[in-house]
Amino acid sequence: MKITVLGGSGFIGSHVADELSKRGNKVTIFDKKKSKWLRKDQKILIGDIFNYKALAKVIRGSQIVYNFAALADLDMAMQKPLIFARTNILGTVQALNLCRKYKIKRFIHASSIYADSNQGGFYSCSKRASDDYVEEFYKSYKLNYTILRYGSVYGSRSDKSNGVRKILDKAIWGKKP
């Protein structure tokens, strides 16, 4: 099966891309940065989710699109809410619109438990709004979807902005969280 993983160079997206490849799928990663973990059986297209032509190129011909293209740093969300809204909401809408155009079978969207919470500030707002768009694309255009709502995720490949990693790093290095 041909699968596109948007944000496939990141923490969660790279793990999902690897598992999809291990299961015999033809995986293409679309990200604004090169993946440190790119496998030989994966393709990557470097680009911005707002570059319509590049995004269309990677989505066209896919059967399933996974969307991990998002910002997730809660501190950064407080400092730069407009950037979060643009990336997490409008980036999702751009991908959804192309999935509708190319008749993708399923859009799998990475969200957060914060989407249904009064915690998480602007990050929560951006995930809730993007979830609403995913659901509305189904209601209006019958674009099948799955929304994944994670808690606080941590592990190998997480970056320094990861909340759990910050707490663990502070504990390991003898600082109070």
Language-model-detected regions and their locations in the chain:
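N-terminal Rossmann NAD(P)H-binding glycine-rich loop of SDR-like oxidoreductase domains
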Residues: 3-23
